[in-house]
Amino acid sequence: MKKFLFLLIFIFSLSFSEEISQNNDLDFLDENYLVEEVQKDNFETLSIIQGKKIEAVDPAQIKDNYSKRVLPLIYQTLFSFDDEGKTVPNLVEKYRWLNGRELYLQLKNGVYFHNNEELKAVDVKNSLEYIKENGTLREIFTEMSDIKILNDAELVIKFEEEDNTFLEILTSRITAIVKREDEKIYGTGKYLIKSFDNNSLVLEKFKKYEENDVYPENIVFSWEIQDSQRFISLFNEEAQIICDVDKRALEYGKKYGILTEENIIKEDRDLKTLALTFGNQRNYTREMKKAIESIIPREATSFFPKEVCESSFSKIDVSIDEKKSTELIEKSNLRKHIKLTILNTEKHSREAEEIKKVMKSYGIEVEILPHNVESYNQKIEEGDYEIALFTIPLAKGGILFNIAKIFMSDLENIEIYNSLSPFLKKLKEECERENREIIEDKILQLIYSEMPYIPISHFRDYTVVSPDLREIFYEWEKK
């Protein structure tokens, strides 16, 4: 009864407390440290609840991190990163550059798709060519000119120009190798897709996977947008793992006894940027954007997090100068009424209220427009808003991949991406890492000067694991 009372207090506080709101890749699943260690007799089915819906399971068509999270369980990539961040072969047995424009690959033997057909060179060719023609990020494959099959296990990828970033690109989950037959898609990973609908994704262990002792038998992914509801599911033992937990919600969970020392709390590896983006309903000049930037409270001192790119030229000043801000507002003729579109979550509501409060002190009224997931996603995709709070996921695969993902997929701003072509070409041609970092920083400086969005903060969410998995978790930690 006492624990139940704590839960009610927690949910009430999370939703209505003035402190919270005055009126949000399963890293460990990548590393297998829970999945492979869970004993079958204890956890035949592992239940995971994340913050948003899985929209697609075709790697080439995925745009969001919530869908991307499940990819390592179903598919494999040609290359991956080791613990030190170096690019290493994955589905590839051997590789070498024949020259600056030809990459030789020899595939591993004994790798099977979920339809029980063995992986062959033609499957790699078909996958990469599909991405180039139909993929969400097809622009990053424009330099790939041809793929020559030598035999079932060997092939050569040819390029129009030198591309020293291509191996990094092939580590990305969206470049996973798949087999497409009619409307079906098969991977080579630990789990195959048992069912997928609007409510859940159910995965089943693939018997022919090279490591056949993977447990549990099934993994069920479902989704719930509100942190509080995911906590309830964990509390009621309806899930063993909840993802995408906001730091503030985590603190309140601890404060009210919903989370205890028995829970495992893991900070996600993947970074996100909370940003203020600009839609098509009104034309905001660069001067207007700079005026807004000078007003709102921000933590991001760089356009990308330092973990993605060390900033020198692209540092951002987050200090507040009221006199300067007032001058920028007057000079830019910034409107006195702004409509702010948000996703109807505790995190977005809290951030929106903070923006509204500070803007009001400068005589600017902010109308907050909350939307459910479907409506919000449609607004963002179509640019049908004035300004919006938007969470931009940042992926492994280097700055080139992130730039392509943000401007070709997340924000669909092809003009900015095309304007960077000379610098991106130079980045692909540069071999020395130090020189590439200088080019990367300069690219970010150029992007930021165009103000495509205002980065408010860079952050990581958290994953919370049930105490039932505690022993399994710590056994992995010892390894």
Model-derived features: positions:
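Ligand-site clamp/hinge motif
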Residues: K208-Y252
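A structural "hinge/loop" feature
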Residues: K52-K68, L91, E117, F166-I174, ...
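Detector for C-terminal structural segments
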Residues: L26-D30, K289-I316, K347-E354, I380-K479
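Aromatic- and charge-enriched surface segment that lines or borders ligand/interaction sites
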Residues: K94-T136, V156, Y284
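N-terminal lobe/hinge region of extracytoplasmic solute-binding protein
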Residues: I49-N99, E129, Y186
